[in-house]
Amino acid sequence: MGAYRYMQELWRKKQSDVMRFLLRVRCWQYRQLSNLHRAPRPTRPDKARRLGYKAKQGYVVYRVRVRRGGRKRPVPKGATYGKPVHHGVNQIKFARSLQSTAEERAGRHCGALRVLNSYWVGEDSTYKFFEVILIDPFHKAVRRNPDTQWITKAVHKHREMRGLTSAGKKSRGLGKGHKFHLTIGGSRRAAWKRRNTLQLRRYR
């Protein structure tokens, strides 16, 4: 087994004495830093490499702190207006994961970079911490490499805002197999529209 395989096994056993201590110390360290800052290198190099990170020019890693818990509707003094069914303010659940929120914040902060992927690095009772891999689409090392040229195209601008990253796709219900029948045809809306449109073909 290579070194990364050993690291992967360490991270799989998060309840071991070593990992519990390490994660506690790291969470304390991350709390002292700002809620979004650049990490000098990936905390989990094995995970980062599996998600597409390379230790070369054009790749950067940002660490993001996201507050845990549900979402409160941003309305003044709870005045939502409208029917009582929509009066909810406090027990609202956000449609996307906290990981996709972290990707969005990193993408907003680094507008010129492209979000490739992200992964979990720790959590405590109040926060979750994620590291987001970003790529500079104008760097020659990225543009000249056939494996990474795809992300330099304009269609991949702010892919994290449009649910095109791995974390973003999960909340959209996209996938393969019997669990993902709700999104056959590209999206929930496309599937619903196709199933609820009466087609009276001319030659039937």
UniProtKB/Swiss-Prot annotation:
Compartment list: Cytoplasm
Pfam families according to UniProt: Ribosomal_L15e (PF00827)
SUPFAM superfamilies, per database record: Ribosomal proteins S24e, L23 and L15e
Domain of life: Eukaryota
Classification via Gene3D superfamilies: Ribosomal protein l15e (3.40.1120.10)
Family: Belongs to the eukaryotic ribosomal protein eL15 family.
Subunit structure: Component of the large ribosomal subunit.
Protein name: Large ribosomal subunit protein eL15
The organism of origin for this protein: Siniperca knerii (Big-eye mandarin fish)
Lineage of source species: Eukaryota, Metazoa, Chordata, Craniata, Vertebrata
